[in-house]
Amino acid sequence: MSKLVKTLTVDEISKIQTNGGKPAWCWYTLAMCGAGYDSGTCDYMYSHCFGVKHSSGGGGSYHC
């Protein structure tokens, strides 16, 4: 299962943020985290964008 996880680059995240603004960036990141992609900031995004804190079970980031 870990082979399905892809780390998003800062450029990928920044591109979405500047092109779509905060709401689009939040929903895009939520979708990517839920699909197994992880920028290393999924916990931050859940708490910052949606006010929800998820437990990652270890590595400091959230994987669905």
UniProtKB/Swiss-Prot annotation:
The keyword Hydrolase does not apply. Stable from pH 5.5-8.5. Bacteriocin with a narrow antibacterial spectrum. Antibacterial activity against the Gram-positive bacteria L.plantarun, L.pentosus, L.curvatus, L.lindneri, L.mesenteroides and E.faecilis. Lacks antibacterial activity against the Gram-positive bacteria L.brevis, L.sakei, L.lactis, P.acidilactici, B.subtilis, B.cereus, L.monocytogenes and S.aureus, and against the Gram-negative bacteria E.coli and S.typhimurium. One of its GO terms (cellular component) is extracellular region. Keywords: Antibiotic, Antimicrobial, Bacteriocin, Disulfide bond, Secreted, Signal, Thioether bond. Residues 1-21 form the signal peptide. Thermostable, activity is retained after incubation at 90 degrees Celsius for 15 minutes. GO terms for biological process: defense response to Gram-positive bacterium; killing of cells of another organism. The keyword Disulfide bond applies. The lineage of its organism: Bacteria, Bacillati, Bacillota, Bacilli, Lactobacillales. Its main location: secreted. This is Bacteriocin plantaricin ASM1. It is found in: Secreted. Contains 2 disulfide bonds. Gene3D superfamilies: 6.10.140.1280. There is a cross-link at S61-C64 (Lanthionine (Ser-Cys)).
